[in-house]
Amino acid sequence: MAVPVPLGRFGSFCLRLLRLLALLELLVHPVLGRVHHLALKDDVRHKVHLNTFGFFKDGYMVVNVSSLSVNEPEGATDKDAEIGFSLDRTKNDGFSSYLDEDVNYCILKKKSMSSVTLVILDISGSIVKVRSPPEAGKQLPEIVFSKDEKILSQSQEPAVSSNPKDSEARRTLDGFKAGRSTVDSKAITERSFSIHKNDGVVSFQFFFNISTDDQEGLYSLYFHKCSGNNVKPGEQASFSLNIAITEKNPNSYLSAGEIPLPKLYVSMALFFFLSGTIWIHILRKRRNDVFKIHWLMAALPFTKSLSLVFHAIDYHYISSQGFPIEGWAVVYYITHLLKGALLFITIALIGTGWAFIKHILSDKDKKIFMIVIPLQVLANVAYIIIESTEEGTTEYGLWKDSLFLVDLLCCGAILFPVVWSIRHLQEASATDGKAAINLAKLRLFRHYYVLIVCYIYFTRIIAFLLKFAVPFQWKWLYQLLDETATLVFFVLTGYKFRPASDNPYLQLSQEDDDLEMESVVTTSGVMENMKKVKKVSNGAVEPQGSWEGTA
């Protein structure tokens, strides 16, 4: 019987890598959930996406700008720069059309836009203007620069930092307090408020609540800095911003599409735990046909189940208090890391045929692992940084793009071992006289290749498109599809490679082992006179104790 050879330096490399990432997990501090705080200094971006949140009726958002200033370098020609905020409302997570226009397009200079409310700042005059679209009717909430009794019943009393400057603003504010948070299409659409200014730094607070069913939707808050024409890159004005955002639905700090997620994660964790328990029962029942890879496969559903449980706990605390408990968040990050690394390692090991059709990883196989494991580590690091970083920071977009690219490379890399095994079996079926067995293995490997492609397609492409296609309150269907596709992939992989004597993948021929061990045997003088003994079936002629040792 061929004895599995330790992975040596490759295994120690993996161990060091996992220790390093575990240390990184402990150093990461989770972001404050749905109670956001963002500090930007000397930023020159034209547009900053502050946040996106799905609101139900009676939900609200409070935006507290504690300091905002514009810094103009010496000799700057960007004297007529405009700054302000925009509140965009959509029915799903699709892209806002007005944000995808020309790079020099400035939304703050538009007099009227459907489904967009503008908050335009005049720092020199200590004035803020609120421009609401007249054609929106009752579809948008009213932005208010004064305390609101309805919001006070659900949150801490916001400080009064601005006063209406005209009678129209007072009438609108009174109407808002009466529960009529809508935009009258016949009213004046622009209102002005005074704001506090000290040494060129302004501070103010505004908020809104969703008072009708028609106002429900996905709201995105942006900060804009519109430069003047013909401004050179080195002469652009920069801004410094310190802002806190609190958003809440009636009974949860979670966005409308995230409210069902804690229950969903707990339910899926039970399914993964049940599938892992069934798999353990199968391994114990067919002990003679079990390999080490089978036990590695057994660890996967339990790790996935733990990750989902901790994720549900994390979301539960965010839902109830607006931010996670740091300890639970770190535990979730660690289990998420282990699950991701274990998943890709297991897929790659099955694809190479390790412990099934060969007991030694070739140099080509080891190179795949030297690529896949660091990529998977980098993908997990990117995911953790994204979860721990505010959306408006400069590095958020970089890490988000990096996560997408690295995850795509990971998915492509794990397909190579399967393709190589298919080619190897195609050549073997035509040369070694055992066409029936090799063709059965070949058919199974092709099925496994299709299975991996479908898994990647559903979890990376279909689920991603679903997130942008469904209404905002059904955004959780994206996670449901992702977790369901993962569960189906686990079950089908276990069924295809289950420990059974009639499984074509496990019907090994001694010649397959000889091909891998040929160089070792021919260079050993001690084994010069040894004869080959043909093996009838996988595990049928070996004593039970020997198989237990390799499993």
Swiss-Prot record:
Membrane-spanning intervals of the chain: 263-283, 293-313, 337-357, 368-388, 402-422, 450-470, 476-495
Glycosylation sites: 64, 209
Coiled-coil parts of chain: none
Alphabetically ordered keywords of this record: Cell membrane, Disulfide bond, Glycoprotein, Golgi apparatus, Membrane, Phosphoprotein, Signal, Transmembrane, Transmembrane helix
Pfam family, one: GOST_TM
Ranges of the Cytoplasmic topological domain: 284-292, 358-367, 423-449, 496-551
PTM notes: Cleaved by FURIN to yield two fragments that remain associated via a disulfide bond.
Disulphide bridges, residue numbers: 106-226
GO molecular function, one term: clathrin heavy chain binding
Record's signal peptide: 1-33
InterPro entries the record matches: CAND6-7_N, GOST_TM, GPR107/GPR108-like
Sites bearing Phosphoserine, chain numbering: 537
Membrane topology according to the record: Multi-pass membrane protein
Topology feature Extracellular, residues: 40-262, 314-336, 389-401, 471-475
Location of this chain's protein in the cell: Cell membrane; Golgi apparatus, trans-Golgi network membrane
Cellular component aspect of the GO annotation: clathrin-coated vesicle; early endosome; Golgi apparatus; nucleoplasm; plasma membrane
Superkingdom of origin: Eukaryota
GO BP terms: clathrin-dependent endocytosis
PANTHER family named among the record's database cross-references: LUNG SEVEN TRANSMEMBRANE RECEPTOR (PTHR21229), PROTEIN GPR107 (PTHR21229:SF12)
Known function: Has been proposed to act as a receptor for neuronostatin, a peptide derived from the somatostatin/SST precursor. Involved in blood sugar regulation through the induction of glucagon in response to low glucose.
Family: Belongs to the LU7TM family.
Name of protein: Protein GPR107
Source organism per UniProt: Mus musculus
This protein's encoding gene: Gpr107
